[in-house]
């Protein structure tokens, strides 16, 4: 029955909303991961250089 089906624009709106939510979610995760990765890399580099410096002394 066609009465049970929601209007086409409503379906499109729902799909767009879902797409936006997923995109935002993925973008946030990637940004957070990138920031933490950079932070960890900097810490690792610092600790390694310090360790190497201590060993040379």
Curated annotation (Swiss-Prot):
Residues 1-8 are virion surface. The chain crosses the membrane at residues 9-29. It is found in: Virion membrane; Host cell membrane. The keyword Chaperone does not apply. Residues 30-57 are intravirion. It is a single-pass membrane protein. Belongs to the rubulavirus small hydrophobic protein family. Interacts with host TNFRSF1A, RIPK1 and IRAK1; these interactions interfere with host NF-kappa-B activation at the level of receptor complexes. Interacts with host protein UBQLN4. Plays a role in the inhibition of the host NF-kappa-B pathway. This inhibition occurs at the receptor level, by preventing the signaling of TNFR1 as well as IL-1R and TLR3. This is Small hydrophobic protein. It comes from Mumps virus (strain SBL-1).
């Amino acid at each position: 029955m066609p009465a049970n089906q929601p209007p086409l624009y409503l379906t499109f709106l729902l799909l767009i909303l879902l797409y936006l939510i997923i995109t935002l979610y993925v973008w946030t995760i990637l940004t957070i991961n990138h920031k933490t990765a950079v932070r960890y890399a900097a810490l690792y580099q610092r600790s390694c250089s310090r360790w190497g410096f201590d060993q040379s002394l």
